[in-house]
Amino acid sequence: MNQVIKTIALCYQKYISRASNKTFSIHNTLSLSLLPKCLLGSLIIYTSHAFGEMELAISGHKYGKDRDAFTMISSCPEGTNYMINRKLILSEFSSLDKFSSGGAFKNLAGKIAFLGKHSSSSIHFKHLNINGFGSGIFSESAIEFSDLRKLVAFGSESTGGIFTARDDISFKNNHYIAFRNNIAKGNGGVILLQGDERGTVSFTDQQGAIIFANNQALVSPSIKHSGRGGAISGDFAGSRIIFLNNQQITFEENSAVHGGAIYNKNGVVEFLGNGGTLSFKENSTRANGGAIYTGKFKANQQTAPIIFSQNNANQKGGAIYAQYVNLEQNQDAIRFENNSAKEGGGAISSSQCAITAHNSITFSNNFAGDLGGGAILLGGKQPSLSLVAHNGNIAFIGNTMLPATKKASLPRNNSILVKESPYKIQFAANKNRSIIFFDPVIALSPSTSPVEINSPEHETPFFSPKGTIVFSGANLIDDAKEDIANRTSIFNQPVLLHNGTLSIESGAHLVVQSFKQTGGRISLSPGSSLALYTTNTLFHGNVSSTDPLEINGLSLGVDTSPSNLYSEIRAGSAPLKLSGSPDIHDPERLFYENRDSAASPYQMEILLSSDKIIDVSNFTIDAPVPNKEAGFQGSWHFSWQPNTVNNTKHKVLRASWIPTGEYILEPSRVGNAIPNSLWSTFLLLQTASHNLGDHLCNNSDLVPTSYLGLLIGGIGAEMRTYSAEKESFISRSGTTGTTIIRLTPTLTLSGGATHMFGDSFVTKLPEFIASEGMVQNVGLTQILGPLTVKSTLCAALDHNAMIRLSAQKNHTRAKWDTFGIRGTLGASYSLLDYENMVRIFTFANVEATNVLQKSFTETGYNPRSFARTRLTNIAVPVGIGYEFCLSNHSFALLGKGHIGYSRDIKRKNPVTFAQLAMNNFSWTANGCQVPTSAHTIANQLILRYKACSLYVNAVATKLESTYLSSSLSCGGYVGF
């Protein structure tokens, strides 16, 4: 039987070679199951289970002009492997007149695999149009793509998928994958997972980008449920679509009726451990899930950003429509921005949503229709929400919904809307982390299940639930601020504060069914309120609980600017119980930096009201609260408004700030890094000057230049300073170019430019300075027998940019220029000259450097202004050096070095005058101290072959055992 098949294989191979393009080749290594459709029946008999896995080598360009010979059919039950030697292109095939699946490949049995066997192995599917499934590949079993350099599909059309299978579809260890402009008149614009059993679409260990762009799934009258998954669609319940350990993943401008990019209604869509940016941009759907429609969506352990931007759904879930959404253990930022849903859930529509931030997570400018949920809509029975700020903050800002009212209305700010009675709502923030709602949260359906804030169940060795949950009206524009609904969050559920801080600020209002505090603090800033949910509130609903409103840690929050508004706590028909003692909440410490508020007496009030009783028997207000940190000094004193002292239903608590008039500057704001940055320009000039002079050897016979020399190389330098108080570090790196012209046998002129980038900082200070400088230089060397005279002149312009990081919001930035000039004049004298091979000499130089920094003012909150400052230094280095030359007719090894001692005979250290204009406070800032004497060591080697040379040059300056500065350069040199 084996002999029969081999004979048939040869016949079919000849048939294919006649029928197809000459550039297309197939090499059968075992037996042939790659056949034209018309001969399929006779082959099935011979490719039974008696044979093992089929392997065929394939490459070339095959056109679809002959439709009967284009489709390759396989049916080996043990599987068929296509070995892709180099580039395989399958293009220009059209078969729309009859329904038939499988355009380029049709696999009837066993797994079909496409395996790259060369570093350039690739497959291209172009313009394959069929009336059936799988315009590229249709398989009754699994499909696999492995080890391909490229896998591309472009401009193809089918009833469903370019790749369609009734079993798993896997992509493993490929490099570049791109699927663009493909159409399915059914489901799955690119990939369709069919079958009666759950299957998996997997992308694993891809080395390059994965791109799905401009793919579509359209409605087909002949298919009951169509238009699903513009890029990928899974039909069967429990199917899985997973991207594991890949690099960049992009879904852009895909569209469908459901799931603009991915559809897997009753299955899982998961992104796990990918190292490149995961991006869903401008995908759209006529129904639900602008980017993704699935049962469960998970994105975990990503090490690069996740971005959902400008996705759109005509119904729900502008970005994601899923029963369950889980984001956790992602190490980079996550952004949901400018997504929209015409009905609800501008970014996410879900029943269960669990989000944990290990880096920042931001929902910004998402929009929903009248169902609400500008960012997130939670529906279904007993929805649940868990937001946890672990190592990053979570923020909702600028999200809106269009309320369903009879009157024409502007969009209303809304971050989250919980439509049904929730099973669970949890907010937890790690210490020094926060969850910030600049847009309200609405949960109107009543429930006895509490909203848990910083619950102890989140406590772990790595997580302390002592962070801040913020409801704020700070980012509203003026027109939006006038509508109180844009600042009001409502929970028709009990709210429990266990730990950390609940901050209601900048005119925000929090309305709750009941409130109980067992730990932590609740803070209200002027114009903000906490109220129980009653029929008298702006939003009508159930009467609030009669359980006492209990607060055992009350703080008054301060805004950045003075306010005459009071804050409120309204208990309605419930008793109000206060215990503990009051405090002031200003985590960013902006109040104490503001002269308008903190330099003068200031007062805040909080109104307490209850129709039952206000119990303050365990609430003490005697102890003042002083400012124990930097800023304007003073203390807060608490008292009851006199006419409310004995009132048991209405009280006003007053906090009065009494300043002392003293201002203490925060140590990290002194700005020592600014004058210290002049040493960065000094290092730039010094490095360029040394690099120029070191290429001028004293003896003309040692210099590989007759008339003209050109030098190009890389250069790097660093400088450190140490003291008992602080340490600074400066580094520079870049490129240099020099032209050397021999004017006479004893007179050499050189000139060039050096371009270097740099970084500098002072330890324990949050100021980081980046620099970019250019040096123009010129040098002259005159040899007068045993005496050599050298001079150099360098001029530099350095651009500096600084960011000052802060644990608070008051980051500042600055840009300024620094100018520098350096001149050197020196002489060396030969002590020993042995046949132009070895030379020992002594030297003495004078090096004068002047650096000027321009004045500048930071940008940001309460910026600092720094006056111009100067660094002047005159140094005299002396020492002993050597030169040697080993050469033959073609090669030469040249060396030069010295050991010296340098003494600064004049030094003006940089000191700058600084000022805080907002606080009318000024001081002086000093750079780090740099020693005025040090030892230097330098060595240079040049390896020359005829007119070409390679060089390496190293210079180190040290004091005792501590290095102060060092530089290293290397490059190429051509002399004529």
Swiss-Prot record:
Disulfide bonds listed in the record: none
Which topology term describes how it sits in the membrane?
Peripheral membrane protein
Q: Which GO terms describe its cellular component?
A: cell outer membrane; extracellular region
Record keywords: Cell outer membrane, Cell wall, Membrane, Secreted, Signal, Transmembrane, Transmembrane beta strand
First and last residue of the signal peptide:
1-50
**Superkingdom of origin:** Bacteria
**Per its UniProt record, what PROSITE patterns does this chain match?**
AUTOTRANSPORTER
Q: Report the residue ranges that make up the Autotransporter domain in this protein.
A: 671-976
- Mark the transmembrane ranges: none
Query: Transmembrane among the record's keywords?
Result: yes
Q: Which InterPro entries match?
A: Autotransporte_beta (IPR005546), Autotransporte_beta_dom_sf (IPR036709), Polymorphic_membr_middle (IPR011427), POMP_repeat (IPR003368)
Where's it found, cell-wise? Secreted, Cell wall; Cell outer membrane
Identify its protein family: Belongs to the PMP outer membrane protein family.
Q: Report the protein name in the record.
A: Probable outer membrane protein PmpA
> What is the scientific name of the source organism?
Chlamydia muridarum (strain MoPn / Nigg)
What lineage, starting at the top, does this entry show? Bacteria, Pseudomonadati, Chlamydiota, Chlamydiia, Chlamydiales
Q: Coding gene?
A: pmpA
